[in-house]
């Protein structure tokens, strides 16, 4: 048996087993759990790319590793499928606040998975592990979307997952297209406009000081 399991208290093992069993039989929308009978601390997952994002139509394999200090310490998350995303490093490590500073012991695996799915809709360039993806997201969304979509088409093609989850905070945020009208495009177009306006204002002040 894996050492992580051996180091977990019996009541935590029961909690994890119960939650994984529930997630397997009643998964959130667009998420599928692949149970690991030999090691329940290694949670294998398939996540469907949300509509209205460059990840749409992709199936992404990932895993959560529950360490010996779980649930006092958060699980570690990794994408096993290659993905172009600001908050996912080249080795697949996921940077999301709920897995770090915002973690609480009462938060379960379902919450973590829904948060990671949300990250596909609303990336956070401020905590980028992939600096190139973070820069493009802020400065050139069309190029970012093109790169992310290409990676999805190459590495993440698969059949559609089934399932609905009314507690999914991101389910109502989906749209029908990737560029122009998708939730990511609208958000970052607004951010880009604000930054351009601020830059113009700063440039104008500098020009006036030179007069």
UniProtKB/Swiss-Prot annotation:
EC number(s) from the headed UniProt entry: 2.3.2.23
GO CC annotations on file: anaphase-promoting complex
PANTHER family, per database record: UBIQUITIN-CONJUGATING ENZYME E2 (PTHR24067)
Summary of the function given for this chain in its UniProt record: Catalyzes the covalent attachment of ubiquitin to other proteins. Acts as an essential factor of the anaphase promoting complex/cyclosome (APC/C), a cell cycle-regulated ubiquitin ligase that controls progression through mitosis. Acts by specifically elongating 'Lys-11'-linked polyubiquitin chains initiated by the E2 enzyme ube2c/ubch10 on APC/C substrates, enhancing the degradation of APC/C substrates by the proteasome and promoting mitotic exit.
Gene Ontology terms: biological process: anaphase-promoting complex-dependent catabolic process; cell division; exit from mitosis; free ubiquitin chain polymerization; positive regulation of ubiquitin protein ligase activity; protein K11-linked ubiquitination
One example GO MF annotation: ATP binding
Taxonomic classification: Eukaryota, Metazoa, Chordata, Craniata, Vertebrata
Residue ranges with Basic residues bias: 197-211
InterPro entries, alphabetized: Ub_conjugating_enzyme, UBQ-conjugat_E2_core, UBQ-conjugating_AS, UBQ-conjugating_enzyme/RWD
Catalytic activity reported: S-ubiquitinyl-[E1 ubiquitin-activating enzyme]-L-cysteine + [E2 ubiquitin-conjugating enzyme]-L-cysteine = [E1 ubiquitin-activating enzyme]-L-cysteine + S-ubiquitinyl-[E2 ubiquitin-conjugating enzyme]-L-cysteine
Active-site residue list: 95 (glycyl thioester intermediate)
Keywords of this entry: ATP-binding, Cell cycle, Cell division, Nucleotide-binding, Transferase, Ubl conjugation pathway
Keyword check for Nucleus: no
Name by which UniProt lists this protein: Ubiquitin-conjugating enzyme E2 S-C
Region described as Disordered: spans on this chain: 158-211
Homology family: Belongs to the ubiquitin-conjugating enzyme family.
Naturally occurring in which organism (per UniProt): Xenopus laevis (African clawed frog)
Keyword Transferase: yes
């Amino acid at each position: 048996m894996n050492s992580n399991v051996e180091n977990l208290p019996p009541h935590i093992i029961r909690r994890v087993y119960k939650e994984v069993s529930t997630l397997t039989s009643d998964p959130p929308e667009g998420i599928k759990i692949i149970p690991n009978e030999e090691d329940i601390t290694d949670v294998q997952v398939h996540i469907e790319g949300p509509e209205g994002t460059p990840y749409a139509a992709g199936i992404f394999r990932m895993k959560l590793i529950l360490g010996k200090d779980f649930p006092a310490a958060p699980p570690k998350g990794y994408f096993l499928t290659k993905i172009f995303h600001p908050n996912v490093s080249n080795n697949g490590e996921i940077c999301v606040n709920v897995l770090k500073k915002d973690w609480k012991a009462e938060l379960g695996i379902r919450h973590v998975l829904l948060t990671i799915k949300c990250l596909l809709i609303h990336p956070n360039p401020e905590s980028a592990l992939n600096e190139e993806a973070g820069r493009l997201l802020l400065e050139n969304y069309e190029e970012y979307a093109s790169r992310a979509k290409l990676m999805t088409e190459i590495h993440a093609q698969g059949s559609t997952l089934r399932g609905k989850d009314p507690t999914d905070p991101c389910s109502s945020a989906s749209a029908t297209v990737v560029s122009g009208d998708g939730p990511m495009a609208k958000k970052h177009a607004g951010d880009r406009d604000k930054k351009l306006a601020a830059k113009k204002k700063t440039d104008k002040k500098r020009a006036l000081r030179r007069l």
